[in-house]
Every structure is written in structure tokens, then in C-alpha cells.
Curated annotation (Swiss-Prot):
It comes from Saccharomyces cerevisiae (strain ATCC 204508 / S288c). Gene3D superfamilies: Phosphatidylinositol 3-kinase Catalytic Subunit, Chain A, domain 1 (3.10.20.90). Present with 1890 molecules/cell in log phase SD medium. Residues 584-838 are annotated as: Interaction with DER1. Residues 560-563 are extracellular. Its main location: endoplasmic reticulum. Residues 809-823 have a biased composition (Acidic residues). Keywords: Endoplasmic reticulum, Membrane, Phosphoprotein, Transmembrane, Transmembrane helix. The modification Phosphoserine is found at residues 374, 376, 379. This is U1 SNP1-associating protein 1. Residues 345-535 are annotated as: Interaction with HRD1. Residues 795-838 are annotated as: Disordered.
């Protein structure tokens, strides 16, 4: 199935020259991504219902054929717009965007019958009885478990299904889900409809509150058509997603237990619940699972990414015997206990969207929305006289938005409301209604005189000056083929005919022109340069701070031993240290890349990326980079790709569990593709699905972490810019081959493991030599990141508990003593010789 987002519907009014088919215009609300063929099917279905009610008012219709009616097969009809036949595969948004940008405007389409067969291979036949009576709905409900989000597909729900029925269905599904293991909610079977606090349909901008007043009964009577805003499903296999916010609580039996105690979590990360009721037999794994369920920054957090620290001691999941550690083994106090929680830094980025707002603000649905009908007291005061320029300057600063939150950008073009045939209202540009009786004559060098027709509203004569409107200036620029500079303190002609100063003017009407000119000059010479240079100033300050912060130790060494060296060597060493710091500080590079917009993906680059992915040109080396890049894994693990991932797992025989996060299966998919067990097409298919989803939702509230998305797009764009190695010159071909082999065999990692000092095993002289070599090696790019990874890996290895002495003895005995005496290959029996003790 394909997921569709709830968008502003396209509105159509359908008429036909055949009065027997459509007696009164049909009004239809359709999804913008639906096709003309789908709309034609729905219109045909509506006509079929009306004719069946007329010709068979009391009979039970058993088939789709109605005898003696003017309705024929759907393939004999077509829709036309402004006399042009519309293709059945044309999207409805392409009709509205080209001619009627206003979504509230109805588009007139005509239904006509073909005089001859079209010969099209596109068959529009459909099931008249059940095609347009239902929709597919998917539920997403938050849970108190490691899975965080529960998905449930509800196929073929009647379009008359009310919100009250949807709430009951969601309640039934969450009750069934919480019967499974791993759920920490203590309510379970006692959940009621009142626990549903609100919901939102994916694609809409604002959520809908539930159970907050008497008006909730009205909302609960709304059906799917009212909620989504369209009359029919945009495709046969389409579905919409309802995201419900549900209230969950911890187990009340534990809270009332006398032996229980409370863990209070202290962490820099945001947790939706900061306390946990535990019993003496609660394990450390269960505590980590609880933290995974209440962590607000990521949906893919695992136990291995969490560290619990109590009074400086790390709480391990397993004890030395290999059994699960209980929380009571570390904590003996019977009262509230503070436990520090440390989260892996890879999961500190907060993702956008509805669930992020819910997890970061658990009280988002706790309050009734403000009543817009209530009014606050208004104090009336006499207004001071202000110039029209000041008023218009304030109007330009007021942002206007639609009900859905989209910005409204006013233009300079004026329209006049007109009436056609006494009832139809249209808006026509003023320039089309005014006769072109005036011309602007311009002498352009050797080309002679150029005449530009303008209307009377586009110019005013003020003494020796001609004031032009913005539209007239654009005509003049187009005719002369150059740009006219507009000074901020100039006077322009507003389209309404008023003279308006282009400069910001906040002075009153009785200020003189000298004060206005002085203020404009001050803004132009002082305020504007300071305002424009402020971002650059912040970048420079941040850069100097990072250089100084990362160069404290080298500058301290120079300060202490500088008296032994000449000044020229001190300056040279200082410059060398500064160069080294800038080279190895990734934050400085990222800071200037963002300021200079070097990492931005424009439409041209995005088109190249899309074409590169669709051509299956991604290489195994690229997929290897993606496997080692956590941001790429997080993007492929978004909930919207859940069905596509499961489809790939099923296609290539990868075992998976639909009730648990499939991060392990995704990593296994990468491993099998890189090892050659599975063809590369598996990952190609998954990446195509991801970018199809991203292209659909990129202009809306994004579902993806922006930094991670930009990183992945840059990786793909750089991959697409790589030239074929066979087309390069010989010296570059040799260099590329050498770099590829070094990267493939991880030569840098191997060298660094020998260079980085090991305090446990290295002697003093060896450590000094390694530190000296490491100092110069860190001048190379990307070495610092590799260095941090290796040091962190060594620290994790040291934290692993060593086997006890008894276990080591048992392993040694198992290696020495055979289990049973079996004959050898020569037929002789083996004997164990144990020397006598002295």
C-alpha cells in the first residue's frame, strides 16, 4: 500500500452537456495526488448511484448493470478542461496549480461521451459496489515500551466511520498489543477512551484535542470524509495515518508495594518520565528498557547505548556469574534513589514532527485550547497622526499566514472583481481592463526610441519627475534588458496610486524632510552595514574561540619555553599550532561551510541525486560508508519506511519480528549485500523508497533530522560526482587506486592502533616515542576523529568484566582432559600422563 498525506483538497464542479447524466453540477473534493482517471471513476460511481435511486427506488440492486439508463461503460467517457481532454494519468494538482493557485476556487470540468473508441490501453473499469465505500487507515499510537510506537493497519473502513468508532478501534488494538511481553504500562486492560488525549492526521499542521468539553461530542460524530477533507480515497491501495497520543502509567501494584522504592533519573537528555517504581527483583535490563521507552530524542535507542551510574559505580546488566543483575544488588537504601543516566551521543538529536512534540512535551494535550470567542478588555486611546509611509511600513512588517500556517506573500498586481452572466464572479487584472492609451518613451543609444505601453494606474507625474509603479519598472527593465537600482530612500508609486517612500519611515506626519533624509542616511551608512556584518562577526568570534580553546596546551608550552628560542621561531611555531588547530577542528570547517552555504542542496543538485539513485548507480563502497554512518541508518529506520523494510526482509529471506525494532535486521541486510550473499538491488530498492517518500513530504513539515538528511544527500552527491577511474589520467588513476586500497584495508586504523599509547602495556620510553609521533600524525585530516574512536573502543574493552579464576581453570581443564577415550586413527587408545609429585 502507498501512504498519502492529508493535504488541502482540490475542489471541482462537474457538469455535462447530457442532461440525463448530470442534472445538477456535482461538487467533489479530491486529493491533489489523485489522478484524473480516479476522479472519473468517482464521478461515474456518483451518477450510477443517482440513476439507481431513480430507476430502482425500491428494488435491491444485485449487480452493477441498470437497464434502460443513459449510463454506459466508464471507458466511453472522459473529462475535459477548457475544451481540452485530460489524460487519465494526469494528477489533479497539475490542473489546479497551473490556472487556479487558490485552493478555495472550484475548477469547472466537463464530462463528455466519446464519439469513437479512444484506443487507450488504460482500463478504467472498477468495482461499483465497493470501490468508493471504504478507506484504508493506519493507526500509530505511542506506547510505554521499547518499541515506542505501535502501528496497526485497518483495511476497508467504511467512509462513514466516525471518530468515536476510530477511538474504539485504536483502544482495542492497543489493549491487544499491551498483552505482549515488554510493555511497561500498568493500565493495560483498564485503558478507556478517555486515555486518548488527542490525534493528528499525518500531513496536517495542527492536532485535534479529545475529551476537553461538551464540543467533543460534535467532533466524535465526524466521519472519515469530514476528518480527511476528501470524498474518496486517492488510489485503490492508498491509506492515511492517524497518530493518537495516549496516556500511560506505571504499574500501580508496584507503587503500592511496601518493598518498592523509587528511582529518580538525572540526565542531560530529556525523559518524558523521570521516576520509576521498582521492586527488589527488578533487573538493570528492565530499568534500561524503561529509559528506552521514555527517551524523547530518538525512537531507536537500545540498552547498549545507556549507562546507569549510581554513586560513581557503573550498573552492569549481568553479574560475574552471567545472570541478570538486580537493581537491589547495587542500591540498598529504602527511600528515593538518584541514578545518573548517560546516553550515547549519537542519539542526542531531536527529530521533528508530531511524535517529537509529544515526547518532548508530554503535557501538550492536558489543557483545553483557548476559546477564541472570549474577548479581552480593550482600552480606547486617541491615535496619533502618522504618515501613509509609516502606516505602510508597519503593514509590510506584519506577517500574514493561512489557517494551515503557510506564509501569504502579497504581490503588487491588482485585480478587479467582475461578474459574468449575472452570477459568475471572476477576478481580472486591472491592466487588462484599462485601455493602453499611454506610452512611456525611452531613448536607448543607437537603438532609437522605445515605446512601452502602460496604464494610467502605473505612473504619476510629479513636477519634473515621473513616478512609476513596480509593475511598470519591471516592464521597463524587461524592455531595456538591464536592472534598475532602487535606492531605499526613493519615492515609488504604490499600485493603489499613492506615493509611498521605499525607506522605513517611523516618524510622524509633521516631521520635516531634513529629519527623514538624515535618518535614512544614518540607516544606510551605519545601521545597515552593522546589521549585514553581524552574522559574519558571530562566525569570526566563534572561530577565534574554538582556535583558542583547542590551542591552550600548545600556547602554554610556547609561553614557558619561548625564552629559549628566537622570535621568528616562536612566531613560526605559533602559526604552525594555529594551522594545526584549524585543520583538525571540524567545528570550524562546519561553521564556515554553513556561513558560505557550501553544503546546501539546491534543486539542480537534488535532481542529479534523484537521477543517480534511480539509475541504480550507488556502489558497494557507498553502502559501506552508509553502514558505518549512524545518521544514514537513522534515516532508513524512520517509521514511514517500516512496511518497505519488512518487504525487503521478506523478499531476501531475512528473519524479522514485526513487534520489535528492526535495526539488527537492517545491519544484517548491509552485511549480506557487502559480502555478496544478496544482490545490491536490495539496498537500491530501499533507497529509492526512501527518496520517493522524502520527495513527497519535502515541502511540508519534515519527518527527518535536517542535519542527518543533509549529510546523506551530500554523500550521495559526492558519489555521483566521482569520475570513472578509467577516464582519469594515469597519475590520478594510480593515486585513486592507492587511496581506495588504503580505505578498503583500513590502513590508517591499523597504523593508529600501534601509534596510540596504551598506558596498561607500554613502557615509559615507548609511550614518550608514541606521543611524539602521534603529535605529528594528528596534523593529518580526520585523524583526530579516528583517534577518539579507538580510545573509546579501548575504554569499552577494559570495561568488559574479566572471567573469574574458577572459570579460567575450568576452561583449561576442558582443553587438557578429553571427554571420553576414543581410539585414535591408528587404533591405539590415548593415555594422559600425569607426573608424580616430588
Amino acid at each position: 500500500m502507498s501512504e498519502y498525506l492529508a493535504q488541502t483538497p482540490c475542489k471541482f464542479t462537474i457538469w455535462s452537456s447530457e442532461i440525463d447524466l448530470i442534472r445538477t453540477n456535482l461538487l467533489v473534493n479530491a486529493h491533489p495526488l489523485s489522478t484524473v482517471g480516479r476522479l472519473l471513476q468517482y464521478i461515474h460511481y456518483q451518477i450510477y448511484k443517482q440513476l439507481r435511486a431513480i430507476y430502482q427506488p425500491e428494488e435491491q440492486c444485485t449487480n452493477s448493470e441498470i437497464p434502460h439508463t443513459p449510463l454506459n461503460s466508464i471507458n466511453t467517457y472522459f473529462l475535459s478542461y477548457e475544451g481540452r481532454e485530460l489524460s487519465a494519468t494526469c494528477l489533479l494538482k497539475d490542473i489546479t496549480s497551473s490556472s487556479h493557485p487558490d485552493s478555495n476556487h472550484f475548477i469547472r470540468l466537463q464530462l463528455e461521451k466519446r464519439t469513437s473508441p479512444s484506443g487507450s490501453a488504460f482500463d478504467l473499469e472498477y468495482d461499483m459496489e465497493g470501490e468508493f465505500n471504504s478507506m484504508n487507515i493506519q493507526f500509530e499510537i505511542n506506547t510505554l515500551s521499547s518499541q515506542r510506537i505501535f502501528n496497526s493497519m485497518e483495511p476497508n473502513l467504511p467512509i462513514g466511520t466516525t471518530l468515536a468508532r476510530l477511538e474504539k478501534l485504536a483502544l482495542e488494538r492497543i489493549k491487544d498489543f499491551e498483552k505482549s511481553a515488554g510493555n511497561l504500562c500498568g493500565i493495560k486492560e483498564d485503558h478507556s477512551v478517555s486515555d486518548l488525549q488527542g490525534f493528528i492526521i499525518k500531513g496536517k499542521q495542527t492536532p485535534m484535542f479529545l475529551n476537553y468539553g461538551s464540543d467533543s461530542d460534535y467532533y466524535k460524530d465526524l466521519n472519515l470524509v469530514d476528518l480527511i477533507g476528501i470524498d474518496f480515497a486517492p488510489a485503490h491501495n492508498s491509506f492515511f495515518t492517524f497518530l493518537f497520543k495516549m496516556n500511560h502509567e506505571q504499574n500501580s501494584h508496584i507503587a503500592n508495594d511496601e518493598e518498592r522504592f523509587v528511582l529518580e533519573f538525572i540526565s542531560d537528555a530529556t525523559l518524558s518520565i523521570t521516576q520509576m517504581n521498582v521492586k527488589p527483583d527488578t533487573t538493570v535490563k528492565q530499568v534500561k528498557d524503561f529509559i528506552c521507552s521514555v527517551y524523547t530524542h530518538s525512537l531507536n535507542l537500545r540498552r547498549n547505548d545507556i549507562k546507569l551510574i549510581y554513586k560513581g559505580q557503573l550498573l552492569h546488566e549481568n553479574n560475574f556469574a552471567g545472570n541478570s543483575s538486580k537493581i537491589s544488588e547495587y542500591i540498598k537504601e529504602p527511600h528515593e534513589v538518584k541514578v545518573h543516566v548517560q546516553i550515547n551521543q549519537e542519539y542526542t538529536e531531536s527529530g521533528p514532527g508530531f511524535w517529537n512534540e509529544v515526547f518532548n512535551n508530554p503535557n501538550i494535550f492536558q489543557f483545553m485550547p483557548p476559546d477564541t470567542r472570549s474577548q479581552s478588555p480593550v482600552s480606547f486611546a486617541p491615535t496619533q497622526g502618522r504618515s501613509p509611509a509609516a502606516i505602510r511600513g508597519e503593514e509590510r512588517g506584519i506577517p500574514y499566514v493561512t489557517e494551515s500556517g503557510n506564509d501569504i506573500v502579497p504581490t503588487d498586481e491588482l485585480y478587479r472583481k467582475c461578474i459574468i452572466n449575472g452570477d459568475e464572479v471572476v477576478f481580472i487584472p486591472v491592466s487588462e481592463l484599462n485601455p493602453q492609451s499611454s506610452y512611456l518613451s525611452v531613448i536607448k543609444g543607437d537603438y532609437g526610441e522605445i515605446k512601452i505601453p502602460i496604464s494610467s494606474n502605473d505612473y504619476r507625474i510629479n513636477g519634473d519627475n515621473i513616478l512609476l509603479s513596480p509593475s511598470a519598472i519591471e516592464q521597463l527593465e524587461s524592455a531595456l534588458n538591464f536592472k534598475i537600482e532602487r535606492p531605499r530612500d526613493s519615492t515609488l508609486l504604490h499600485p493603489s496610486g499613492e506615493h509611498v517612500r521605499a525607506a522605513d519611515n517611523t516618524s510622524s506626519a509633521n516631521d520635516n524632510n531634513t529629519v527623514e533624509n538624515d535618518e535614512s542616511a544614518w540607516n544606510r551608512r551605519v545601521v545597515r552595514p552593522l546589521r549585514n556584518s553581524f552574522p559574519l562577526l558571530l562566525v569570526l568570534i566563534r572561530t577565534f574561540y574554538l582556535i583558542g580553546y583547542n590551542s591552550l596546551v600548545p600556547f602554554f608550552i610556547i609561553l614557558e619555553f619561548g625564552s629559549f628560542l628566537p622570535w621568528k621561531y616562536i612566531i613560526l611555531l605559533s602559526l604552525l599550532f594555529i594551522f594545526r588547530t584549524v585543520w583538525n577542528t571540524q567545528e570550524v570547517w562546519n561553521l564556515w561551510r554553513d556561513y558560505l552555504h557550501l553544503n546546501e542542496i539546491d534543486e539542480v543538485k537534488f535532481s542529479q541525486i534523484k537521477e543517480f539513485i534511480n539509475s541504480n548507480s550507488l556502489t558497494l563502497n557507498f553502502y559501506k560508508k552508509c553502514k558505518d554512518t549512524q545518521s544514514a541508518i537513522d534515516l532508513l529506520m524512520i517509521p514511514n519506511l517500516h512496511e518497505q523494510r519488512l518487504s525487503v526482509y521478506s523478499k531476501y529471506d531475512i528473519e524479522y519480528d514485526t513487534n520489535t525494532p528492526d535495526v539488527g535486521q537492517l545491519n544484517l541486510l548491509f552485511i549480506k549485500v557487502l559480502s555478496g550473499e544478496i544482490p545490491k538491488d536490495a539496498l537500491d530498492e530501499l533507497f529509492k523508497e526512501f527518496f520517493e517518500l522524502y520527495e513527497t513530504t519535502r515541502n511540508m513539515n519534515t519527518l527527518y533530522p535536517q542535519d542527518s538528511l543533509n549529510e546523506l544527500l551530500l554523500m550521495i552527491w559526492k558519489e555521483s560526482q566521482k569520475k570513472d577511474i578509467n577516464t582519469l589520467p594515469k597519475y590520478r588513476r594510480w593515486f585513486q587506486t592507492l587511496c581506495s586500497q588504503i580505505a578498503e584495508h583500513n590502513v590508517l586504523d591499523v597504523v593508529l592502533r600501534y601509534i596510540i599509547p596504551d598506558p596498561v602495556n607500554d613502557r615509559v620510553i615507548t609511550a614518550v616515542i608514541k606521543n611524539f609521533v602521534l603529535f605529528w600524525v594528528t596534523l593529518l585530516p580526520y585523524v583526530k576523529e579516528k583517534l577518539d574512536d579507538i580510545v573509546a573502543q579501548r575504554a569499552r574493552d577494559r570495561e568488559q568484566p574479566a572471567p573469574s579464576a574458577q572459570q579460567q581453570e575450568n576452561e583449561d581443564e576442558a582443553l587438557i582432559i578429553p571427554d571420553e577415550e576414543e581410539p585414535t586413527a591408528t587404533g591405539a587408545q590415548p593415555h594422559l600422563y600425569i607426573p608424580d609429585e616430588d
